[in-house]
């Protein structure tokens, strides 16, 4: 999905599951956001460090000025061995896990929101952040009735301009609610 915002072209994607090389990234995108699940279902417990390394190598070679990554539920190394997972992320990629980042007047916040865990990000999400990025969706927005209720409350409280998520493959797309796009 391409978003034009504050004179930047932002391309967001998720759930490539090892098939990132098939993704057609627009050449004019200057900010890339991956909302998780770059690892493949079959290999998620076996060679996940190799899969993550391949993804990060591919992601870092993209021509965008900024590349942001928020892990998903298949990127299990971030849960099982976070120190190793963090070492795999090149310095050219911004890893957001319950943390924020700003670029050229655009604020981003990545919250850990995977199906089995939602951390204490609610204490950290800044009000009015431009982009809230989670892997899991909020309820009522492309979620197949599986959205995280607490995430929905956090979105109501923090009022991000955009909420980017993935996880529910069959409902990929874009929806709008009031002033927030999810």
Whereabouts are the PLM-identified features?
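Pre-active-site segment of Zn-dependent metallo-hydrolases
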Residues: 18-24, 51-54, 115-125, 141-150
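Core catalytic region of metal-dependent phosphoesterases/phosphodiesterases
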Residues: 13, 18-103
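Active-site-proximal segments of metal-dependent phosphoesterases and phosphodiesterases across multiple
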Residues: 39, 44-49, 127-161
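Catalytic metal-binding/acid-base residues of hydrolase active sites
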Residues: 17, 38-39, 73-76, 112-114, ...
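Active-site-proximal beta-strand elements of phosphoester/diester hydrolases
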Residues: 7-17, 105-114, 130-135, 181-182
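Short acidic-hydrophobic surface loop/beta-edge motif
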Residues: 1-4, 97-105, 174-179
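Hydrophobic/aromatic beta-strand patches that form the interior of the parallel beta-sheet core
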Residues: 11, 33, 68, 96, ...
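Conserved beta-sheet core of the metallophosphoesterase superfamily
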Residues: 65-68, 140-182
């Amino acid at each position: 999905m391409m978003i034009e915002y504050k004179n930047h072209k932002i391309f967001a994607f998720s759930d490539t599951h090892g098939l990132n090389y098939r993704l057609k990234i627009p050449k004019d995108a200057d900010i890339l956001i991956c909302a998780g699940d770059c690892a493949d279902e079959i290999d998620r417990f076996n060679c996940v460090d190799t899969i993550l390394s391949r993804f990060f190598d591919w992601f870092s070679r993209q021509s965008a000025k900024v590349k942001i990554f928020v892990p998903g539920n298949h990127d299990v190394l971030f849960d099982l061995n976070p120190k190793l997972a963090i070492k795999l992320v090149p310095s050219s990629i911004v890893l957001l896990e319950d943390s924020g980042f700003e670029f050229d007047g655009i604020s981003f916040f990545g919250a850990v929101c995977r199906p089995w865990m939602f951390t204490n990000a609610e204490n950290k999400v800044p009000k009015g952040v431009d982009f809230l990025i989670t892997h899991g969706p909020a309820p009522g927005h492309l979620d197949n009735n599986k959205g995280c209720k607490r995430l929905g409350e956090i979105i109501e409280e923090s009022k991000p301009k955009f909420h980017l998520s993935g996880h529910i493959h069959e409902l990929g797309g874009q929806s709008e609610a009031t002033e927030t796009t999810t």
